[in-house]
């Protein structure tokens, strides 16, 4: 999708976490095949949306540099204590110029090229508040992927209230709203790097 004065979907790259299992390193800036993970994701996410935001609480200048080719804007959490992806979602929903926000984590370099379209189709068909990706493996086991989701920005005030009340679990907040699950069979597309070991494994895939 191309940028427009009234975008319909805002893309949100979630890059604001602590990365405790990577010794606090900024995950989105770690290299895979010589390229920062965040840039891999931006290259896949941005063509699917009308505008792009990057949720980043550290290294804002570096993320702005990575996001420049996509006209991405940087947004930070409203609180400084790294409360988790819900806070990044809220920042993105507040900053979005579109009525829908499609989020993806910064450490998933293989995300599907049609993830936003499929989430949007399901959201629209079910008149849902949230559409969330779920992977299904060869044994039919389902694995929710809550940070791959499409959400209505009209939920921002409710999310702010939930955060103020101490909610930190993404799926728990989703459960308060009409959420549709969208199945994806390609597990590889959702592989991520929560640790140095997983980053090394990504490089071998």
Swiss-Prot record:
It is found in: Cytoplasm. CDD domains: MobA. GTP binds at residues 14-16, 27, 77, 107. It is an enzyme of class 2 (transferase). Monomer. Belongs to the MobA family. This is Molybdenum cofactor guanylyltransferase. It comes from Burkholderia ambifaria (strain ATCC BAA-244 / DSM 16087 / CCUG 44356 / LMG 19182 / AMMD). The lineage of its organism: Bacteria, Pseudomonadati, Pseudomonadota, Betaproteobacteria, Burkholderiales. The gene is mobA.
